[in-house]
């Protein structure tokens, strides 16, 4: 798309989906609503796509970039897609209340974390692929105008990952019922929302595009002895299967493998039953994490297997060492998909 090409809209509007009424101090308050901004092009291909941002982000990241260029929204509009950009419940324009949603994580305003993981990986990244990074405009360091604009766009994320997935699943179900058949694109912390949406609406979600989805399965990893600020509550210890440049958490963070909240498995999990993780015995190269799968016999993700899926990972990203784990988890669970790294 030409960066200056004109895009005409048939309709542009804002609305909210999801939410439940909760009584707080004798007041009835709507909790878990999701902000949606819709863009309907004048020249439509009669296809829809829902864009779900990641942690520390809002839907604005799909509209424009930190250096002022057009975001992915405009690319999809130029190809005729009707685009629905959301702010996750409890985030940005969906509204936040500590009474309703609890504590925030502190990572979104952590400058060192942002430089290392997002903007200056070649200089500060502590995983093997970081040296390949060359795409960020400007220096990627504090004091740089584009970096400061990026940091100003960051918004806090609530700590309760299970609850945010449950609220988002409810809101996305309502949105999908409203717009009909759709593609769902989720980024990073919003990546697993693709799995949740496909699980609850497998006949309406035509495809999932998971851009560096939250992972790896079950256990988190810490690079170079430095924990990402959102992992501060977890304990890490060197395992026999860890490479010298990372450590794996002692306890699982995602009890459902690729999500915090439940998915539909066959055979189904009982109320008091959990997936059992087991290290993948297929050895990975030195620059890749040794990830976990289900203990065999593996349960199948019967609803996700009905949906076209693409996992997309950038070569220098901190996801690059471990997103194969998500791909292998889906494969073991009977889900055909494409994985590009």
Where are these regions (language model features)?
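A conserved short beta-strand
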Residues: 203-222
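Catalytic histidine neighborhood in serine/cysteine hydrolases
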Residues: 331-341
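Short beta-strand/loop motif that positions the catalytic acidic residue
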Residues: 305, 311-313
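Conserved acidic catalytic loop of the alpha/beta-hydrolase fold
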Residues: 135-137, 141-155, 159-183
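Gly/Ala-rich beta-loop-alpha elbow adjacent to hydrolase catalytic centers
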Residues: 185-194
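N-terminal cap/lid segment of alpha/beta-hydrolase-fold proteins
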Residues: 2-44
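Short, surface-exposed "cap/lid" segments of acyl-processing enzymes
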Residues: 43-45, 49-85, 91-132
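Conserved alpha/beta-hydrolase "acid-adjacent" motif
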Residues: 193, 317-325
